[in-house]
Amino acid sequence: MNPDRSLIQKLSGLEGYLSSKIRGQGHVIPRVCSVLERGELGLQPPDKPLGSFLFLGPTGVGKTELTLECSRYLFGEGAIHRFDMSEFQHLDSVKLFLGDESGMPGRLGKVLESHTRGILLFDEVEKAHRLIWDLFLQMLDAARITLADHRTHDLSGFYVVCTSNIGSQQLMRPTRLPFATLERAVLAELHRHFRPELIGRFDEKVVFKPLSPDTQREIAMIVIGEKVERYRKMGIELEVEEEPLELLIRTGITKALGARPMKRTVQKYLGDVVRERMKLRNLF
């Protein structure tokens, strides 16, 4: 097999791209890139998905954001298919996900019917009903799955990503223990929650670190920079000084939600500034 030169060049830039977008998780990115590169080069087993990941860690540390950036880099926009598994906790909600025997497709089946390639993202997988966990055993072990509506689907063009907050309290409590020790504690808790045969089928199981103050600042700078650049392209020049920057960091990153509120905070703050400036310039 001789892979296309342009594909090799593209994959050569993958790790650098992800590192520029995701901060504070340098131990995660090389492991993720290894699986993605094998998948894109056709080196994964042909009877399995392109690759599979279990991302563990607190809310707002980059698990979902990393998945989004992987999808954006490899496939462009619109190739990530996200499922909030907390919506499928109860037995009567399982058919909404898997379909039912009458032939009515569920949400997963509808995605697989209309797409053949991309990333399937299952957020907070630990909250799903146990019947759905059984599906993951099948999904990770074979490139073809049959859902409750009796339809069979091909997953050989997809990456599967599951995120979980299992063990997050181990990472969030004040401690001087090294991260490797905390990581082992998280994985031990994972094994108390899921069956070993399910855990063992993921290509990579990675634990994300809580965000340090320096990392929080870096994330804020990235989000602000992206927004400022967008406004610049609209002909609006902005410069964020130190005092409002610190305010954005304090309000955009919380202990409970990590950096998840940052984009919304920056959008509101800078959007209000731009709105007032546009009004003063009589632009609307």
Task: Mark where each language-model region is.
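AAA+ P-loop NTPase nucleotide-binding core of proteostasis motors
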Residues: 1-284
